[in-house]
């Protein structure tokens, strides 16, 4: 397994090993005993039938360094504290009303994206970088408020974290060898990032508290409530089993920023990649978008709710290219028998969502991009159908699905409405390199560069 850790094709390698050794496969990763799940049948056992037994997270050097007292939602151990953090996230931060409230941010940032593309017509455009800038802006403004120097600094730190996530810390594989903790090249990089995060976060909290004291509404760098304001309000009013601390707020904000930026940008670049590679689908989805939005020069989220084929295109993209190709690892907290094998306590659980989404035993012509397949398959983002788990499933599934999907749908609709797209240098669709690179998310190995030609001008 160690030779796979340094490759760009770890998802492929694990899938190939599973074809030889079975859908539940044991791996010895240094001192860490791990099992890899590569089928929906076994995933159902660990994510549904025995979900609580596999609800913990393994302790990693990175989380110990980056988090304050290991307080957050994503990597905290399962229990009363985790349940409170989950409630905070789903009820206060990512409920339907809050996602809708941030619609104006998404619409403004999509407008900026469209304008930036209009200024570069007929020239190769690095869409990967444009998508990253867009999702960074949407998530940061929703989280901390107005555009500012702090936002720019924060985006850079989040990008640094994402780049480090592509590697691994050998001390995580040999936790008993203390010398490795000292010699690890990852540790000083993480410590540098932590210092930057502390400085940025403390300034963000200070600014928010000062502005809350100055405004009658009690919040707002811009007079509107962002997610930091929400958490400060929750902290002030209390009423939870555990008092909401500044460390909790730090952890949740970090979860939001990491979870809401790279994943959405990755989904956008893969969707556009698949559309360029599949002209039939591109023509069909553009026809739907342009018919539904015909005559409009200013477009809002409400205008795109009926774009059913666009939604199928996004679903199919996430089947083939789940941003978290290997779901965040879990830890067995209670010994269980899975698929006839006894799984001991403290075994690390790895779920290959990429392999499950391409399983030819369930998906017809599994490697082909066919959005229409979802007309006949009951599969949504809620994790009920274990053959389709781009956001995970069970207690630990992603709580930010609505926010993430909203951040993908609108820019796609507008880019397809306003522009025609082609590959540069006369390249044919089938020649587009679709190689992947494994990191914080499963991104394209090479940036997606396309040429846009104006079709329907936007309202300046």
UniProtKB/Swiss-Prot annotation:
Q: What InterPro entries would the database entry show?
A: CYP450_71D, Cyt_P450, Cyt_P450_CS, Cyt_P450_E_grp-I, Cyt_P450_sf
Query: Which Pfam families did the record assign?
Result: p450
Q: Where does heme bind?
A: 398
Per its UniProt record, the required cofactor names are: heme
Picking any one GO molecular function of the record gives: iron ion binding
Name the UniProt key words of this record, in alphabetical order: Heme, Iron, Metal-binding, Monooxygenase, Oxidoreductase
Biological role: Probable heme-thiolate monooxygenase.
Name assigned to this protein: Cytochrome P450 CYP71D312
Q: What species was this sequence derived from?
A: Panax ginseng
Q: Lineage of the native species?
A: Eukaryota, Viridiplantae, Streptophyta, Embryophyta, Tracheophyta
